[in-house]
Design a protein with these regions (language model features):
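GST-like domain detector, emphasizing the conserved glutathione-binding G-site
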Residues: 1-110
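A generic structural-conservation signal
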Residues: 13, 139, 164, 184-185
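Terminal-tail/helix-coil boundary detector
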Residues: 181, 185-190
């Protein structure tokens, strides 16, 4: 959603109760995983956030939010773009599951503690990368910043931001001031 706003693309947003597989008729037909997000573009259906960001930039961004393949920071850009889901968001999904989604009797505090620690240990790479920098790579705002910024924002909703270090705090605060971020949040909240 944030990527669509930053690119200025038109789209239809369907807000659903979470988790959508339980409350939205036909959602499992569109996305058998029952996860969010689900992005469609014509006949194409995508369900991986980083892949969606990559696709949007390649198809519609004209490198506005990407890094050219011949740029020295291209590999770094892709690494950050995909690190967001694989490394930063993954442990948060377990924190979310075992603090909010599971019935009280199935919640496992040790899982929450372990994966919170794991998440914070993974943020060391973000903290180091942002030392003396405004953005993660290529000296500009990119889809990688959207992806990693969203992971940091998700941490706020889970109460994990209390242990964010100064660079991560500054970075997230700056990203949250972007008009595209604000517009996406407003539309998401209805």
């Amino acid at each position: 959603l944030w990527a669509l706003e930053e690119l200025g693309l038109e789209y239809e947003l369907i807000n659903m109760e979470f988790p959508p597989r339980a409350t939205y008729p036909g959602y499992l037909d569109l996305n058998p995983l029952g996860t969010v997000p689900t992005f469609t573009d014509g006949e194409l259906v995508m369900t991986e956030s980083s892949g969606i960001c990559h696709y949007l930039e390649d198809m519609y961004g004209s490198r506005a939010l990407g890094v050219a393949k011949d740029h020295p920071a291209y590999g770094e850009y892709l690494n950050w773009l995909y690190r967001s889901d694989a490394t930063l968001t993954f442990p948060q999904t377990l924190v979310l599951r075992y603090t909010r989604l599971e019935p009280e009797e199935r919640r496992i505090p040790q899982v929450v503690e372990d994966y919170s620690i794991w998440y914070h240990s993974r943020l060391r790479s973000v903290e180091m990368a942002l030392e003396g920098k405004e953005f993660l790579c290529a000296d500009k705002f990119t889809m990688a910043d959207i992806a990693v910024g969203y992971a940091l924002f998700l941490g706020v909703s889970l109460g994990l931001d209390e242990r964010y270090k100064p660079n991560c705090k500054r970075y997230l605060a700056n990203l949250m001031e972007r008009p595209g971020f604000k517009s996406a949040r407003q539309k998401q909240q209805g």
